[in-house]
Amino acid sequence: MSKEKNKNEVFGKEDVLSVSGDYGIVNQIEFQGRSFAGASVAPYGIVDTGDIVYTKSPLKSNPYGIIKVNKGKAGIVSTLYAVYKPLDNVCSDFVQIYFEQDARMNNYMHPLVNKGAKNDMKVSDVNALKGEVCFPSKDEQIKISEHFANLDHLITLHQRKCEQLKELKKFMLQNMFPKKG
């Protein structure tokens, strides 16, 4: 677990990161249009590229929170997040892939988390790591991670192509059936 804090305020409010279920770790201002940081960001945790972040915020599919890896630039997160440095025998991208399946994440966290009266998570940052997982060798983790990264890239390319085809269809329909007037 990382205890590295932004004590010297190397990072400012423009560097605050959030964790999104769909988009991973994102810059708060770029993603949400503004920073939700408090008056001081000195107690915020520093997140380097490759660090693993656990958010206790419940999501519809993940009532015990989610785990994501910072694939972007370094920044800071609220004290509500737990930040972990990957061990030498762990590929952080594999950790995210492993926990992306909702059922696996929920089954891992369920025995570790107690929900409070206000539906808040009662699990310490250290206890969030007490569940057992069985990972392959680091070389195998890297190969699996690269395979899924290639699939994600392919999906992105197909999504772009689909959007371009929709635009082409729209253009063709407008030209086939011009507005009268």
Residue ranges and their predicted role:
Residues 1-181:
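Feature detects amphipathic, helix-rich regulatory segments
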